[in-house]
A protein has these predicted regions:
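Patatin-like phospholipase
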Residues: 1-49, 57-274
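Single conserved hydrophobic/aromatic residue that forms the stacking wall/gate
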Residues: 272-283
Length: 283
């Protein structure tokens, strides 16, 4: 079974990124990653959930984080979703999957330049599914598929929804195979005010769940980055992608500069990088 967690790989990786869910705030992942790369903290493997899977797949496909913004420029939320008569979700993700297919060079996870593990929730069996091979667009869509808002995604006769329901910050996914894990959590806070409508109430309720299951994962990371000032963004404000990117970039630079002053030896250890196993195989 593809979602099984046993024996994915026997490789060891120097540094892994674990990227949380967070909907529109996922653009802060790209900013945080840009800052990390500029400090020479490069991942050999990425684990992503929902918005983190989306950010991770574009980087693993060979794109610099700041360049990914170009793919979304000029798009609105409604360009990537399709409003449907509510049956199992308000929107379906066919346009989103087409967008991924049009803008990614790789079509399958195993074709990416960097190993990427995408986490979704198996709706039929109530368990986590960790995808490391197969069609990219289907698996990213499955991981992003927040119940009620989006219709579940069917893969090989099984329905999947947002991985954040069970694990919104996927550190455990790669913890045992990485020397160091950098976790980026872009959904640590919630706005104090919210609208009383079906979408707003559903999203706020999910956020309580996401925060709760992220607490144990936060403790497992070697470096935790939680960009601030993200709680005021609406999940449909795609036009603010660059602004959200800069929030992640600036917050991460602040954290890294502080660590360089305070941590010394620990920081030098984290900065150690080595080629990924796929790089070694290609040489």
């Amino acid at each position: 079974m593809e979602g099984a967690t046993n024996n994915w790989f026997s490789n060891k990786y120097s540094i892994g990124y674990a990227l949380s869910g967070g909907f529109i705030k996922g653009f802060a992942h790209l900013g945080a990653m840009q800052a990390l790369l500029e400090h020479d903290i490069k991942p050999n493997i990425i684990s992503g959930v929902s918005a983190g899977a989306l950010a991770g797949v574009f980087y693993a496909d060979g794109n610099e984080p700041h360049k990914v913004l170009d793919y979304f420029a000029g798009h609105k939320f409604q360009d990537l979703t399709k409003l449907v008569i509510p049956k199992v979700g308000l929107f379906e993700l066919s346009e989103f999957k087409d967008f991924l297919k049009s803008n990614l060079k790789a079509k399958k996870l195993e074709e990416l330049q960097l190993p990427l593990i995408i986490t979704a929730t198996d709706l039929d069996h109530g368990r986590l599914a960790h995808f490391h091979k197969g069609d990219i667009a289907e698996r990213v869509a499955a991981s992003c598929c927040m119940p009620v808002l989006f219709a579940p995604v069917k893969i090989d006769e099984t329905y999947y929804v947002d991985g954040g329901l069970l694990m919104n910050l996927p550190v455990s996914t790669i913890r045992r195979v990485c020397e160091k894990v950098v976790a980026i959590n872009v959904s640590p806070l919630m706005a104090p005010k919210y609208k009383m409508n079906i979408v707003s109430v559903a999203l706020r309720s999910y956020n309580f769940m996401f925060r709760s299951n992220s607490f144990p994962e936060r403790e497992k990371a070697d470096l935790l980055i939680e960009p601030y000032n993200l709680d005021g963004y609406s999940n449909r404000e795609l036009e603010k992608a660059e602004e959200i990117f800069m929030q992640g970039y600036n917050a991460t630079n602040d954290i890294l500069e502080r660590l360089q002053i305070e941590k010394g030896t620990i920081w030098n250890c984290l900065l150690y990088t080595s080629p990924s196993p796929r790089d070694t195989e290609r040489s």
